[in-house]
């Protein structure tokens, strides 16, 4: 980190990006939506504010991309033929570092584009396709082959094709626990995936309630706010706004988008279109 910060300070943007790529295969993704929890422990907090390393990383990626990309070369081929199942951040990063080490790597993605959750779930107002496309280009520049539109049925299928090693990087798509004891609810990730693929495809009515106080809840609330017909989006959380786990910047953007906050409420269930909650008190 100090090395690329120094390079950026001196105007050596290409050097800065090369330094970042030594340890980070996805500078556009991490430079845009990394939760930057390291900033909470930055020693500069004792004097002024944390170093904005995420923003500097993105600046280096954007400024150095066009010149650095053609310079990235595939390593000499080794005797390893590796298949990576899943073209999300984990799969892409694995492919990048393995191909740099000389492995013959192929990434298999069932969707029509690489990118995983950032591409198909996280709203476009958080990260755009252009940033994801550039990270895919950086990962494939070292020689990894990207195969889209193919779902792998079994590991044996790939072994039969001559792959010596197989990495499964399909993500943790398990549903979260239900928030309500009774009544219907949408799963957050399913909702985000549907509205990103086809905005307006879910009839939400005029009033929407989002339960939770983390970054995903903010994404859901902001995405719901821009759906056709929606007038009010209320975010309900069991504690107060100050104790919400979401990043401060995510809270601010939700407020700016018109999301309303209802604090110290523990949702019980939905009955006849009414959300019933218990009132909480901070301990």
Annotated model-derived regions:
Residues 83-108, 147-159, 173-176, 190-248:
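Rossmann-like dinucleotide/flavin-binding elements
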Residues 106, 145-147, 186, 260-262, ...:
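General small-molecule cofactor/ligand-binding pocket signal
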Residues 104-107, 111-142, 193, 221-267:
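Rossmann-like dinucleotide-binding cores of NAD(P)H-dependent redox enzymes
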Residues 164-165, 206:
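Conserved acidic residues
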Residues 51-53, 57-82, 100, 104, ...:
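Flanking helices and flexible, charged tails adjoining ferredoxin-like Fe-S electron-transfer domains
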Residues 148-161, 264-274:
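A conserved short coil-to-beta-strand element within the FAD-binding core of flavoproteins
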Residues 1-81, 129, 168-186, 200, ...:
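Ferredoxin-type iron-sulfur electron-transfer modules and their immediate structural context
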